[in-house]
Amino acid sequence: MRIERVDDTTVKLFITYGDIESRGFKREDLWTNRQRGEEFFWSMMEEINEEEDFVVEGPLWIQVHAFEKGVEVVISKSKNEEMMNMADDNMNNEFDRQLNELLEQSFEDENEESVQGNQQQRRSHASDHSKRARHTNGRLVIVKFEDLESVIDYAHHSNQPTDDFEDLLYMLNNEYYYAIHFDDNVGEEVINDFYSQLLEFTQPSDRSEMYLNDYAKIIMSHNVTAQVRRFFTDTEEI
């Protein structure tokens, strides 16, 4: 892990995915497992404090940027006097709230959309998809991946085109659901062929899109396979 002291109130660090795994964490822990994500963050803060004497004395502002090789994190102490004078319990609660919001984002700068911070937008977006699916009968496909490894396997070994549809990846009860909305100009034969190839990596979904919109969490959207390939290496190469 590389740590850079920006000024008295800000530090910046870069940690590779290999370093993350060497510390006993999986890279997906950072955005699918809140408890493990918090453990990882606090272990980093202890190391930063030891190397840079950067003591947490109030609310922190955190920015995360995901790259191909690892993650860059910028941590700043609040300069707001009102926040700095906050009671300890309230201060800790405020920090926990910020950290939880951070950990619920799906690499916000890479996806250009925060799942946590745009809950209303997400519901509107999902509603639009539902309406479209009702009006384009047969153009919606939903399948289920058993686990994240199956998602990664599909992303790295599928050669299906991605120009003729919009897609969403949901997570529900540690299972992953993949919804695909095909464009109007895509023929039924093409859709059926796509679905047949998809079933080599998945199984038919037992959940409707309406159910997923209400109870599941959207963790990726817009060319899901490309995002998965960017963040995760092929499991067969490990």
Curated annotation (Swiss-Prot):
Annotated region (Disordered) at 108-133
The Swiss-Prot or TrEMBL record annotates one GO molecular function as: protein-macromolecule adaptor activity
In this record, what's one Pfam family? MecA
Superkingdom of this protein's organism: Bacteria
> What is known about what this protein does?
Enables the recognition and targeting of unfolded and aggregated proteins to the ClpC protease or to other proteins involved in proteolysis.
Q: What is the UniProt domain comment for this protein?
A: The N-terminal domain probably binds unfolded/aggregated proteins; the C-terminal domain interacts with ClpC.
Q: Which NCBIfam families match?
A: PRK02315.1-3, PRK02315.1-5
Give the similarity note. Belongs to the MecA family.
Q: What assembly does the database describe for this protein?
A: Homodimer.
Which protein are we looking at? Adapter protein MecA
Q: Which gene encodes it?
A: mecA
